[in-house]
């Protein structure tokens, strides 16, 4: 090797060593070829270094990779720079509400029922109230049992309608018809006035009916009506005028209804539960023996039942028939025709009235004749206003022309009118007529005045 080639070869070896290429063969080459290879090796080393650096970054991302946040803003620089489209956003929200996931299966929201529970849970009662205004207009009357009928927010009104609806087993049409008839009847009869202002014949109705209140530890005040039919002295006189009897009976009933205080109610009756606004009735048939045969009493009884079943529904809690004789079977038969099965179940016949007190926890408060310890009804109970009947005038004496001549008559003209022509012939033979004036202390009266004399006055 010449001296000239040595420096060139040494420089090439140094360049290869600096580039880290240990695989370059140490072979003598032509100077030009060697120089080209050196240049190529240098270029390869320069290219490979960045690739190795990239591989290192891939192998150690947590150490050498730049933070992700640094490259994120370059994703969509144009979109982030634009202002938001408000209309588009609102349209997109509306579309999501209508077409969002699960929108087809989502049930529609029902409006909240703000009505009272007694209406929301009782569609029949709610329907009944919808018809109330029309009923009141047709009847032209709005008072029932002392309650002025208003609307579904008025508790006393609600209780009245519940009673009519229950009496008709939830049938709104029947309840509507009955309420209308009852209102029309009250307008015609004015039962409040019958109870508060009218008076009734004592000779017909004294001792026949009473109203009394007793205290029950659980229920509070219990209202009783008593009908004592054994006190009737003259059946034809008491029951003969059916209208008068019904008015008396209605007056007694209105007294009891007033004691129930329906107009002061503050809580609604439980439609399917107990009703605190009801009374107990007692009918006493002690010594009654006329009800089977007397058609007048049968007529009065049937008409009374008809009126009460229409005008006073659901006011009866229980009804006791005490001292009932066997012949009273027709009464219960009649009741079954006019009243519902629910009402019939409230009836209790008792043969011996003394056993009545056993039916109640307040037995001692009942009169002694019914098994209690209290005074009899005449002293312990109330009744309707009675009036003393004006004594009827005694029958007038018959006119002298039609009557037999009195034995003490001294009026000759009266004798002449009364006697026949044959008796006139014997008139002169009768000395008594001449002596008669001495027996009379009163002055003679004209014959015409004798028609106004009573039998006792004539005898004087």
UniProtKB/Swiss-Prot annotation:
SMART domains reported in the protein's UniProt record: SEC14
Q: Give the residues the record marks as binding heme.
A: 229, 249, 283, 285, 319
Give residue ranges for domain CRAL-TRIO: 198-378
Q: Which Gene3D superfamilies match?
A: CRAL-TRIO lipid binding domain
- Write down any Gene Ontology CC term: plasma membrane
Role? Non-classical phosphatidylinositol (PtdIns) transfer protein (PITP), which exhibits PtdIns-binding/transfer activity in the absence of detectable PtdCho-binding/transfer activity. Regulates PtdIns(4,5)P2 homeostasis at the plasma membrane. Heme-binding protein that may play a role in organic oxidant-induced stress responses.
What this protein is called in its record is Phosphatidylinositol transfer protein SFH5
Q: Which organism is it from?
A: Ajellomyces capsulatus (strain NAm1 / WU24)
Q: What is the lineage of its organism?
A: Eukaryota, Fungi, Dikarya, Ascomycota, Pezizomycotina
């Amino acid at each position: 090797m010449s001296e000239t080639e040595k420096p060139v070869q040494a420089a090439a070896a140094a360049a290869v060593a600096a580039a880290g290429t240990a695989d370059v063969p140490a072979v003598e080459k032509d100077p030009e070829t060697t120089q080209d290879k050196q240049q190529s090796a240098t270029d390869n080393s320069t290219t490979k270094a960045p690739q190795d650096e990239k591989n290192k970054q891939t192998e150690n991302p947590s150490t050498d990779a730049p933070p992700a946040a640094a490259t994120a803003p370059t994703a969509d620089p144009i979109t982030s720079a634009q202002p938001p489209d408000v209309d588009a956003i609102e349209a997109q929200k509306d579309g999501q509400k209508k077409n969002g996931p699960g929108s087809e299966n989502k049930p529609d929201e029902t409006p909240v029922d703000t009505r009272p529970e007694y209406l929301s849970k009782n569609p029949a009662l709610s329907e009944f109230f919808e018809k109330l205004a029309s009923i009141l207009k047709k009847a032209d009357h709005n008072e029932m049992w002392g309650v002025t009928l208003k609307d579904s927010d008025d508790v006393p009104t609600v209780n009245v309608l519940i009673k009519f609806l229950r009496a008709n087993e939830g049938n709104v049409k029947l309840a509507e018809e009955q309420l209308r008839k009852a209102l029309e009847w009250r307008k015609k009869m004015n039962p409040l006035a019958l109870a508060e202002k009218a008076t009734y014949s004592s000779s017909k109705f004294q001792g026949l009916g009473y109203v009394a209140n007793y205290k029950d530890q659980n229920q509070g005040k219990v209202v009783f009506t008593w009908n004592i039919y054994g006190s009737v002295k003259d059946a034809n006189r008491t029951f003969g005028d059916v209208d008068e009897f019904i008015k008396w009976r209605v007056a007694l009933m209105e007294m009891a209804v007033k004691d129930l205080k329906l107009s002061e109610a503050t809580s609604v009756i439980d439609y399917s539960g107990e009703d605190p606004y009801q009374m107990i009735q007692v009918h006493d048939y002690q010594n009654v023996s006329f009800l089977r045969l007397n058609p007048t009493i049968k007529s009065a009884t049937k008409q009374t039942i008809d009126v009460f079943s229409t005008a006073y529904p659901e006011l009866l809690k229980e009804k006791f028939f005490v001292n009932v004789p066997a012949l009273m079977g027709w009464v219960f038969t009649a009741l079954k025709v006019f009243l519902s099965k629910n009402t019939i179940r409230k009836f209790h016949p008792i043969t011996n009235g003394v056993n009545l007190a056993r039916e109640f926890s307040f037995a001692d408060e009942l009169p002694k004749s019914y098994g209690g310890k209290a005074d009899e009804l005449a002293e312990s109970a109330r009744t309707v206003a009675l009036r003393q009947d004006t004594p009827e005038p005694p029958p007038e004496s018959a006119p002298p022309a039609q009557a037999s001549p009195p034995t003490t008559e001294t009026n000759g003209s009266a004798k002449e009118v009364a006697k026949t022509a044959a008796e006139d012939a014997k008139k002169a033979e009768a000395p008594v007529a001449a002596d008669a004036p001495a027996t009379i202390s009163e002055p003679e009266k004209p014959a015409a005045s004798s028609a106004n004399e009573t039998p006792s006055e004539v005898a004087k």
